[in-house]
Amino acid sequence: MTGSQVIDAEEDRHKLVVEYKDALQPADFYHNFKQRSIRSVQLIPHLEFDDRGDLTAASVTAELWGKFLIALFECWVRADISRISIELFDATLQKWCGSENPQLRRDCQACDWHRLCPHAREETPDSVLCAGYQAFYSYSAPHMRVMRDLIKQHRSPMELMTMLR
């Protein structure tokens, strides 16, 4: 894992900055933090802007961010549900189970995925990654539905891992 790492000692959550080069190798990135016994992760996309306000070449693009999240999700959903906490995946499942987003930004109201997106509330640099988040939400939706339904039946979402084998 080449990205920066900051440890939040209060919550024991590792904040991992996902650099462009990390996003190109999502399976390696995932297996690296898994091998290091990291069990709680917040992913932070590396975003750097030039003087014109455009993303620099060192930044993660929306397309690459979406592919990265999907590949990471594939690793997680097949082997580590409830074993490794990835904040975005956990928050997405919570939204599928009924928690609501507060006040939405105007440009997010028409998005099919606004109820899931953590960035729909305020203007953030992450909003340049909307297409990547949308790709992830679209891809993960069938899996999230199954996990939601398992939870509603008072069963473990981990059962999905067996179903996917």
Question: For each predicted feature, which ranges?
Answer:
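Radical SAM enzyme [4Fe-4S]-AdoMet core and its adjacent flexible, acidic
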Residues: M1-S99
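Flexible mid-to-C-terminal extensions adjoining Fe-S/redox cofactors in radical SAM and related proteins
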Residues: E100-R165
